[in-house]
Amino acid sequence: MKVTLAGTWSPRGEMARLQRLHSQLQQRYTAIVLSVPDTTGAAERKFLQEQPATTMVVTPRRGWGRYLALEEAMKQEADHIHYCDFDRLLHWVETDPVEWQQTLQRIPQHEFLIIGRTERALQSHPQSLAQTERIINDVASSLLAQPVDVGGGSRGFSRVAAQIVLTRTTPGGWGDLQWPILVNQAGLAVSYLAVDGLAWESADRYREQAATADQQARAALTYDHDVTHWARRVQIAQEIIQEGLAARFDEVTSAM
């Protein structure tokens, strides 16, 4: 079956890696849709515009990227959509291409697939992320009646599932918990798969290749030493949980 990639990308020095890995993406996806902020540089825009079967969507507001990428992906000729935060996807393709390809083969088997992180992948993140996201996952697991990690930034959609999300939400918000709850409430099955490849990607920024485990660990310690990062991650966890609870109890469908 045909699978379209939908992703959000805020470029932070990944250009060389994208140029190196883009051919692999084109081989596996029928089409590629990337939403980028209006601050995206000329070099990144030019590269995306020159690639075949690749659509770039410039987002007018912060937080709109996921929705707009999914919306544009629905215009492509594909049976299923793989959404993935693009910096995470580059890390995954570079560090574990076999697992990535195996996961793509699994997506058409499900109506909605949450692609989460193994414990190993989660532990590669700063503790300010790992600990606050465990709280989100506890809530998500309870609401969805199965153990899940919703913080991996990756989902598999049937066209029906994607249309449910687009119909019942508007641009803005996170979607991490909201989207699977809406799909589940609509009567579609929500499945789960944990992978190693969705390890912490932010340590890759401005590097020629993905960070090693040691480089990830050092960057994570530095990140955690800034108390404002902890405060921000607590705020994000609260927003994601509130958004999910609102969806669960049929309140607002567009948060933030």
Give the predicted meaning of each segment.
Residues A78-H91:
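Short beta-strand-to-loop acidic/aromatic patch adjacent to the donor-nucleotide binding site
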Residues Y67-H80:
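Active-site nucleotide-sugar/metal-binding loop of Leloir-type enzymes
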Residues Q49-W64:
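Conserved donor nucleotide-binding strand/loop of the catalytic core
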Residues L89-L122:
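Conserved donor-nucleotide/metal-binding helix-loop-beta segment in metal-dependent transferases, i.e.
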Residues I136-N137, V150-L166:
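Conserved nucleotide-sugar donor-binding
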Residues G173, L177-P180, N184-M256:
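C-terminal catalytic/acceptor-binding lobe
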Residues G7-R28, T39-A42:
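Short, well-formed alpha-helical segments that are part of the catalytic scaffolds
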Residues Q109-G151:
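Short, flexible, basic/aromatic active-site loop/helix in glycosyltransferases
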